[in-house]
Structures are given as structure tokens and as C-alpha cells.
Amino acid sequence: NNMSVLIVGGDHLGSIPKELKKIGADDIRHVSGRNRNVIKRGMPMAMDLIIVLHDFINHNLANVTKKQAKECNIPIIFAKRSWSSIYKKLPHHLTNN
């Protein structure tokens, strides 16, 4: 059950990566969203899920990420930087295993 997750926003992820590993994520990447070049070059898009920490990124980046995710058919969730906020929004097939 290989799963890759891209987290956009926030500098310190705290327990989030550890919790994601528990539900099967083994490839976790993080872009803080401060560096515009990353966004211009494009996100690493071969991901199974994108988590946007919306309290840490600007509106423009949120929209760009959303658009790219939609084009690539990748599920995207917008959450605060807390595991409970993320967990509540995860696709059901991830939380029911």
C-alpha cells in the first residue's frame, strides 16, 4: 500500500508525517509555500493526495495548487495545521483501514 502525500504550507509539520505514516503514507513531501519558484516550476504531481495547510499559505498558492490537483485528478484537502483537522477531511478509504 504505497501512498504518496504532498503537504503544502507550514514550516513545522509536528506530528503530521508520523500520523500519515500510520495510515499508510510512505512518501511524504513538503513544500512550505514560501518559495514562489517551486510553484512556478510546478508541484511534484504524481501524488496520491495533496494536503494544503490553508492557515499558512496565501490565497494565490492555494488556488494554483487546487487547479493543478484538479488537472491531475489528485484528491486535495484544505485543513488547518493540526492532525485532527486533517484526519477529519481525509478520504474515507484512508481512515477505514
For each of these PLM feature ranges, what is it?
Residues 1-24, 39:
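Redox- and metal-dependent alpha/beta enzyme cores, enriched for Fe-S-associated oxidoreductases
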Residues 8-10, 33, 81:
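Cofactor-binding loop segments of dinucleotide-utilizing enzymes, especially the Rossmann-like FAD-
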Residues 18-19, 40-43, 63-65:
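A short acidic, amphipathic alpha-helical/loop segment
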Residues 26-43:
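A short, well-structured beta->alpha microelement
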Residues 45-47:
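Alpha-helix C-terminal capping/helix-to-coil transition sites in glycosyltransferase folds
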Residues 58-60:
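Short glycine-rich, flexible loops that bind phosphorylated cofactors or substrates
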Residues 69-97:
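Ser/Thr/Gly-rich flexible loops in soluble cytosolic domains mediating phosphotransfer, phosphorylation
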